[in-house]
């Protein structure tokens, strides 16, 4: 009987030890799996991973004197002559991600999005399953019926999104404003390098910082852009969305480019969160996914 009493605590200790070792093993395997996923996560995102050189003395330039990085990027996307005279970009896209699940609203798959390259003006068709159309014009948004009748309108759309919680639900006008200004910024980026009302600062080879000022509908006034040092193509864009709290740090990662009439365009975009401002990017979740199925510059 004493032997049985003595054996039971020993078994319990062994059982606890086995449980602890199993937990450690699971943790190690999880870390190894995370590391494996991280290594195949091609666009992850430190200065070294983006193949950037060391920071240099910051230089600010206007359209008349493009920095080395800006000139390389503009050339990569078709050149100054193409974008100086560009009028519109037409596209077909599918948008998804955790953000729109939290907001409770999204546009249908394969929606047509058209932006005016020269100014913040975007048309989203359709904006919902009813077939209505959403229009962004500066800071105002409108929803039109199929016949063109005005269904809803909001002149101060940015104020309705300013520093909201990520879980705050949106109405259709919120959605149109967010996607409208976002896609205008994404599609017109090469032309933005030529604008005199945007202050571009080269922080390092392949790294630009933009000050958009207070009068343009964009994610945030200050943004950073990482471009490939060899190809000049965009790889990452960091900002704090106007639709999120001030401590939100978004990293917009370009995974793939397509080609339309000889002009490259980002075709697979993923918006993720970064660990601190301009830091490492969390591989998941995807807050926003953008798959561009068709893209045409006019």
Model-derived features: positions:
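Membrane-interface motif at the C-terminal end of an N-terminal transmembrane signal
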Residues: 29-48
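N-terminal mature ectodomain segment of secretory-pathway/periplasmic proteins
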Residues: 54-57, 61, 75-153, 196-199
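Catalytic loop of the DD-peptidase/beta-lactamase superfamily, centered on the K-T-G motif
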Residues: 130-142, 146-171, 217, 278-297
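Gly/Pro-enriched, hydrophobic low-complexity segments
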Residues: 204-298
């Amino acid at each position: 009987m004493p032997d049985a009493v003595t054996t039971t605590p020993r078994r319990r200790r062994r059982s606890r030890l086995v449980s602890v070792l199993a937990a450690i093993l699971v943790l190690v395997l999880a870390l190894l799996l995370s590391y494996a996923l991280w290594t195949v996560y091609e666009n992850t995102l430190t200065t070294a991973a983006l193949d950037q050189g060391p920071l240099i003395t910051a230089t600010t330039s206007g359209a008349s004197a493009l920095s080395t990085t800006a000139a390389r990027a503009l050339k990569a996307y078709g050149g100054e002559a193409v974008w100086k005279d560009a009028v519109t970009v037409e596209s077909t896209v599918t948008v998804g991600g955790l953000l729109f699940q939290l907001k409770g609203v999204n546009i249908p798959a394969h929606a047509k999005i058209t932006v005016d390259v020269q100014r913040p003006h975007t048309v989203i068709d359709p904006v919902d399953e009813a077939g209505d159309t959403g229009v962004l014009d500066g800071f105002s948004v409108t929803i039109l019926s199929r016949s063109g009748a005005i269904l809803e309108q909001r002149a101060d759309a940015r104020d309705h999104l300013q520093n909201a919680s990520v879980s705050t639900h949106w109405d259709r006008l919120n959605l149109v404003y967010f996607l409208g200004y976002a896609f205008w910024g994404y599609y017109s980026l090469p032309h933005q390098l030529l604008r005199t009302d945007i202050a571009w600062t080269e922080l390092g080879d392949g790294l630009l910082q933009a000050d958009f000022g207070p009068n343009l509908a964009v994610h945030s006034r200050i943004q950073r852009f990482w471009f490939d040092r060899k190809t000049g193509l965009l790889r990452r864009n960091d900002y704090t969305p106007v639709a999120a709290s001030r401590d939100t740090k978004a990293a917009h990662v370009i995974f793939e480019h397509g080609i339309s009439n000889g002009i490259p365009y980002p075709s697979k975009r993923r918006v993720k969160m970064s660990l601190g401002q301009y830091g490492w990017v969390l591989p998941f979740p995807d807050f926003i996914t953008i798959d561009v199925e068709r893209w045409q510059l006019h």
